[in-house]
């Protein structure tokens, strides 16, 4: 029963429309325009260790990564790019610093894109025309990757620090060099370790060009700190419609970068939701170890890809109500758990059987969603 309190119904919050951007291709992945926002990561292996690099790319792909970047600091790394690009399941971006010759090798190797840093590639500007020709011939896109830690000295002298304005000027100057040869297949990033400066830089850049933007907070830090910085910065910009591809930079396993990136997009309804675990923060009313139970449920359901929301609640006081919007859940207490679907209790099980029963029901619901797109609630 719905009680009318005489209060106006607030509108459902929505994000700003996506910024209209020029669309490019990174391998077979569309970036910009009306393409979905892609999630990127970067390998941590020595690229010339082909086996280790491809193994990590496979793990990233399995986690949902759309595009992967590999470092190319040496001749040995450049020489194996054809193998990496050919065997990778997802498009490869070669990350080039200091040596323009590696740009050409990466293009010829079949990389989906090449990242260049205008702050540190010596004698780069006078080779732009040749790079444009090679990139056009091979269908390779470019990422102009400006980084606060390697900004051109001239801009540091002008602005006194790697400000948002300095990074934007660097990016637009580099873009103009490509534009003079009619080349527009590039995306831009202006990364800073401070989310506030980073946000300001992307907002300024978005107002001055229509190129797709790659979002990133550089040197974000360990997993906990980096996740917060990236979520704050990306959430702000994506809510404004700014951003076409993202990379969460963490001092952690790159697979964690992908997981965080996907969850950020899912949280903003910018990517179809997969499995979601919601759980209460625990309090003095709890009669079960919510932290352990939530972690056990999360681990047990890890292989399920269906868009299920599963709630783990620590008591029956608010558990059923708070978990009503979940597809499946449990409100635990007094050594047992009330299992519910869409707010309706379907079974009460002993505490020791909660995880097993949730896994069983979640798998059944996932199977039904695969075949019918809907699930049936059965009470027993």
From Swiss-Prot:
Catalytic activity, as annotated: (2E)-4-hydroxy-3-methylbut-2-enyl diphosphate + oxidized [flavodoxin] + H2O + 2 H(+) = 2-C-methyl-D-erythritol 2,4-cyclic diphosphate + reduced [flavodoxin]
Protein's name in the database: 4-hydroxy-3-methylbut-2-en-1-yl diphosphate synthase (flavodoxin)
Pfam families in the cross-refs: GcpE
Species assigned in the record: Cutibacterium acnes (strain DSM 16379 / KPA171202)
Residue pairs linked by disulfide bridges in the UniProt entry: none
Positions with a binding annotation for [4Fe-4S] cluster: 280, 283, 315, 322
Cofactor(s) named in the record: [4Fe-4S] cluster
InterPro entries with a match to the protein in the record: Dihydropteroate_synth-like_sf, IspG_bac, IspG_bac-typ, NO2/SO3_Rdtase_4Fe4S_sf
Family: Belongs to the IspG family.
Cofactor, free-text remark: Binds 1 [4Fe-4S] cluster.
Example of a GO MF term: 4-hydroxy-3-methylbut-2-en-1-yl diphosphate synthase activity (ferredoxin)
A biological process from GO: terpenoid biosynthetic process
């Amino acid at each position: 029963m719905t009680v009318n309190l005489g209060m106006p119904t607030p509108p459902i919050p929505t994000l700003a429309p996506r910024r209209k951007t020029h669309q490019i291709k990174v391998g077979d992945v569309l970036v910009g325009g009306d393409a979905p926002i892609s999630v990127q990561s970067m390998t941590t292996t020595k690229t010339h260790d082909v086996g280790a690099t491809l193994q990590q790319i496979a793990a990233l792909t399995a986690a949902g990564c759309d595009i992967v970047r590999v470092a190319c600091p040496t001749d040995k790394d450049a020489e194996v790019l054809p193998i990496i690009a050919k065997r990778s399941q997802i498009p490869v971006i070669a990350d080039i610093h200091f040596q323009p010759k590696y740009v050409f090798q990466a293009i010829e190797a079949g990389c989906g894109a090449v990242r260049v840093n205008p702050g540190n590639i010596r004698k780069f500007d006078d080779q732009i025309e040749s790079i444009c020709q090679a990139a056009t011939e091979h269908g390779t896109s470019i990422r102009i990757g400006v980084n606060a830690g390697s900004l051109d000295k001239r801009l540091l002298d002008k602005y006194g620090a790697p400000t948002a304005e300095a990074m934007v000027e660097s990016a637009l100057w580099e873009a103009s060099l490509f534009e003079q040869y009619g080349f527009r297949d590039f995306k831009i990033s202006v990364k800073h370790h401070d989310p506030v400066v980073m946000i300001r830089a992307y907002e300024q850049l978005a107002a001055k060009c229509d190129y797709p933007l790659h979002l990133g907070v550089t040197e974000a830090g360990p997993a906990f700190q980096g996740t917060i910085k990236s979520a704050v910065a990306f959430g702000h910009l994506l809510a404004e419609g700014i951003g076409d591809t993202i990379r969460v930079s963490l001092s952690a396993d790159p697979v964690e970068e992908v997981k965080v990136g996907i969850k950020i997009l899912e949280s903003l309804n910018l990517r179809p939701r997969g499995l979601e675990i919601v759980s209460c923060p625990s309090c003095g009313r709890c009669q079960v170890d919510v932290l352990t139970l939530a972690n056990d449920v999360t681990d047990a359901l890890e292989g399920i890809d269906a868009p299920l929301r599963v709630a783990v609640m620590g008591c029956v006081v608010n558990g059923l109500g708070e978990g009503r919007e979940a597809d499946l859940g449990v409100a635990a207490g007094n050594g047992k758990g009330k299992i519910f679907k869409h707010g309706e209790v379907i079974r009460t099980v002993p505490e020791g059987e909660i995880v097993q029963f949730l896994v069983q029901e979640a798998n059944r619901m996932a199977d039904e969603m695969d075949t019918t797109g809907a699930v049936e609630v059965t009470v027993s």
